[in-house]
Amino acid sequence: QAIGCKYTFPNEKIKFTGTLGHIGTTSFYPSKNLGCYGDGGAIFTNDNDLAHRIRMIVNHGEKIKYHHEIVGCNSRLDSIQAEILNVKLKYLDEYNSTRKIMANNYNLAFEDVGEIQIPTVISSSEHVYHQYTLRVLNGKRDQLKTYLNDLGIPSMIYYPIPIHKQKPYSNNQILENTDILSDEVISLPIHTELENSNQDYIIDNFIKYFK
């Protein structure tokens, strides 16, 4: 979700997200900053042996056609999706810049609104705003979501059920901060086709809720 984002180390070395360790992943789901028109994704690695193994896994475990060395699956990106991404990749920086401008519009408009916490970015990093997510305090999040929906303003909660409460991972862990965030976060519309007039409508009505 942070493709195109950069991190600056204390020695001023700059690296992109997905390249900070030996392996990184990204999704090309259509709503992502760099999305195809179907399902897709990519794995980044600086380890040639690992890259070789990954290529086999995503191609039925094949090293040579019809010779299966390991258990694999069919996770190849089809040529149509690849071509769409090849074109859109040229515009990734532009897409991310547009999202940053929209996020800044929200931040400036909401900086004096009580009972919310807008996203913050540390000086050594940046945000490409796949989502514009803020916190709504004092138990007002769900009522705000209903209010926005009644005005035709979409909003989303990422995510209403945290991982530690999902059945496959539930082991009665108590993660207090995770639960608090899950009850408070809400994401407002942000994408490259959002017109200024529509964002103004969202901002005006969002602020009205807290007056």
Question: Over which residues does each language-model region extend?
Answer:
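Acidic, glycine-centered active-site loop in nucleotide-sugar glycosyltransferases
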Residues: 20, 39, 132
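Hydrophobic transmembrane-helix microenvironments that flank and shape a buried ionizable site
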Residues: 19, 36, 75-76
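PLP-dependent aminotransferase class I/II
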Residues: 2, 6-12, 46-211
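Short acidic/polar capping segments at secondary-structure boundaries
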Residues: 30-32, 48-49
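Glycine-rich phosphate-binding loop of ATP-grasp-fold ATP-dependent ligases
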Residues: 33, 37-42
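Short acidic donor-binding loop at the edge of a beta-strand
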Residues: 23, 40, 53
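Active-site pre-lysine segment of PLP-dependent enzymes
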Residues: 1-31
